[in-house]
From Swiss-Prot:
Record-annotated VHS domain positions: 19-148
GO MF annotation: an example: K63-linked polyubiquitin modification-dependent protein binding
Function in brief: Component of the ESCRT-0 complex which is the sorting receptor for ubiquitinated cargo proteins at the multivesicular body (MVB) and recruits ESCRT-I to the MVB outer membrane.
Keyword Oxidoreductase: no
Domain UIM: 262-281, 293-312
Source species taxonomy: Eukaryota, Fungi, Dikarya, Ascomycota, Saccharomycotina
InterPro entries: ENTH_VHS, HGS/VPS27, UIM_dom, VHS_dom, Vps27_GAT-like, Znf_FYVE, Znf_FYVE-rel, Znf_FYVE_PHD
Chain intervals with Low complexity compositional bias: 245-260, 315-328, 534-553
Region named Disordered: 1-24, 233-296, 309-328, 429-565
Organism per entry: Yarrowia lipolytica (strain CLIB 122 / E 150)
Protein name per its UniProtKB record: Vacuolar protein sorting-associated protein 27
Location, primary (coarse class): membrane
Gene field: VPS27
């Protein structure tokens, strides 16, 4: 795991070391020393540690302030010179001066601040980078702030207690400080955490812990430091600069507890493999060179299509659509010339990765790498091919969108038609099984409603009756075929009825004459069902008069005589 992913939070550590739950006047010495190791090994930036301590000093709880002052004093004595520079800055000293000037502050906290400022001023005496603490003490004394009397213990405090060893600052150079090999993008530089020198991968590939720097995890060291540390010597070897090499001022070193990072080696291997593939890769022949193969494939496809059509014609199953489908199914789909090969995709991805890595390199590094320029030229030649591929993809996308819209419309129309058919079938099913009621077709003039017939249909093999009614003297005509109708019970003779005028003569059976006689309507039956004529009602009698006795039944005849009124 890399060092930046395992960095502990300094704020959490400081907050835990200065917790309100700690008894007054006591501190967790083990946790304080652990924080000192984090600062001294540069695992956490010194400025972040200083700001975290300052936030705890500004807390309103006096116990938290006293614990923060105690932790600050321990870190000053064990944190290293880079941490002392941050402590001696105005950002940290000004809050301490504000507490010393405030008469309303907690007396114990104020007295402790004055005591520590006086001790630190004595310890930092004679160092320009730490002069701000001494100036603060002088200014407070000039303002009339009384400091506690210095004891003999404070007089014994010298600058030796701040000489705690810390990882050295890194030295920058253009060549390896051991082999003299110049650095490049492929031959990267590596710093030794013990001496701060810069070396190549071959000269700085050992890992070991550095307890004298507070580094308890394996870190990268050069070969010389590794041998000395194995022998029990913590002093860094002296590396003489290579003649002709240019060195710069020491650079700010990153945290020293970085674990082995194999990403650089993997990138170098990937670059070498990609370049080897690029050298051995042969571009495909141009499209003109493959035209013959395409012609052969097309001829074979056409011949196969013709054979299929001939076979279908012989079997009687040929059709235009079938022939089109057969020819389409036998067509060989040639690979698109605009598709990128695996090597081309690998080169594009590798160039993108290298460009991202070059952002953290010094200016001009890319100009000193001819292989990267060669890779860039190779990828640049793919731009027209990528443009054509993108154009074809966009066209295909548009056509697919159009087809999708058409298909959606067709499906919607089909669903509507299917729903209509289903509704129609459901309606027919609901009305099915019930035969339509027969209707009676009749013609009448001046007939009362109660004389309307209730029989409809056509009687096959049954007698047929026909009636006619005119405005003149009505008469009844009837012809009975087969079975005599129910009107055949009337006596044979001439019956004369008139709507106006004198009443007709009484029948020979006797009885009062009928006053009003309705003319028989004209009926026309078609498809009437069979009925039992024996139970059929007799013809209605004239209103107002007694009903005449029925005549004896007449024998069945082949044809009934015509009755005239």
């Amino acid at each position: 795991m890399s060092w930046w992913s395992s960095t502990p939070s300094i704020d959490e550590q400081v907050e835990k070391a200065t917790s309100e739950s700690l008894p007054s006047g006591e501190s967790d010495l083990a946790l304080n020393l652990e924080i000192c190791d984090l600062i001294r090994s540069k695992t956490v930036p010194a400025k972040d540690a200083m700001r975290s301590l300052k936030r705890r000093l500004l807390n309103r709880n006096p116990n938290v302030q006293l614990a923060a002052l105690q932790l600050t004093d321990v870190c000053i004595k064990n944190g290293g010179s880079h941490f002392l520079v941050e402590i001696a800055s105005r950002e940290f000293v000004d809050p301490l001066m504000a507490i010393a000037r405030n008469d309303d502050a907690n007396p114990e906290v104020r007295q402790r601040v004055l005591q520590l400022l006086q001790q630190w001023a004595v310890a930092f005496a004679g160092q320009l980078q730490l002069q701000q603490v001494e100036n603060a003490v002088t200014q407070l004394k000039s303002e009339g702030v009384s400091f506690p009397s210095a004891s003999h213990d404070n007089a014994a405090v010298t600058s030796t207690f701040i000489d705690t060893k810390a990882p050295p600052e890194w030295i920058d150079s253009d060549v390896c400080m051991e082999s003299g090999v110049a650095f490049s993008f492929l031959n990267r530089k590596h710093h030794c955490r013990n001496c701060g020198g810069v070396f190549t991968q071959a000269c700085c590939q050992n890992y070991i812990t550095l307890p004298h720097f507070g580094i308890n995890v394996p870190v990268r060291v050069c070969n010389g430091c590794f041998k000395n540390l194995k022998k029990g010597k913590s002093d860094a070897p002296i590396h003489k600069p290579v003649p002709g090499a240019t060195t710069t001022a020491p650079s700010s070193a990153p945290p020293a507890n970085s674990a082995p990072n194999d990403d650089e080696d993997d990138i170098q291997k990937a670059i070498r493999l990609s370049l080897q593939e690029q050298e051995s890769y042969k571009p495909p022949p141009p499209a003109a060179a493959t035209s013959n193969d395409d012609d052969e494939d097309m001829k074979a496809a056409i011949a196969a299509s013709l054979r299929d059509m001939e076979n279908e014609r012989q079997t009687g199953q040929t059709s235009a659509s079938a022939g089109g489908l057969s020819s389409a199914s036998t067509t060989v789909m040639a690979p698109s010339l605009t598709d990128l090969t695996a090597t081309e995709e690998s080169n594009i991805n590798l160039l993108s990765l290298l460009v991202e890595r070059l952002k953290g390199e010094p200016q001009g590094t890319i100009l000193r790498e001819p292989k990267i320029q060669e890779l860039y030229d190779t990828v640049g030649n793919l731009r027209p091919k990528l443009a054509r591929t993108m154009g074809e993809t966009i066209s295909k996308y548009d056509s697919l969108v159009d087809m999708h819209a058409k298909m959606t419309t067709v499906i919607r129309y089909y669903d509507a038609l299917l729903e209509e058919k289903l509704n129609q079938a459901y309606t027919n099913r609901q009305s099915g099984g019930y035969a339509p009621q027969p209707h009676l077709s009749h013609q009448m003039t001046g007939q009362p409603p109660h004389l309307a017939p209730h029989l409809t249909g056509q009687i096959t093999g049954q007698p047929h009756m026909g009636y006619q009614h005119t405005g003149q003297a009505p008469y009844l005509t009837g012809q009975v075929t087969g079975q005599a109708p129910y009107l055949s019970n009337q006596p044979t003779g001439h019956l004369t009825n008139h709507y106006t005028g004198s009443a007709p003569s009484a029948p020979q059976y006797g009885g009062p004459p009928a006053q009003n006689v309705y003319n028989a309507p004209s009926y026309q039956y078609s498809g009437a069902p069979e009925y039992d004529y024996a139970s059929s009602p007799s013809a209605p009698s004239a209103p107002g008069g007694p009903s005449a006795p029925s005549a004896p039944a007449q024998p069945k005849e082949e044809s009934a005589p015509l009755i005239e009124l």
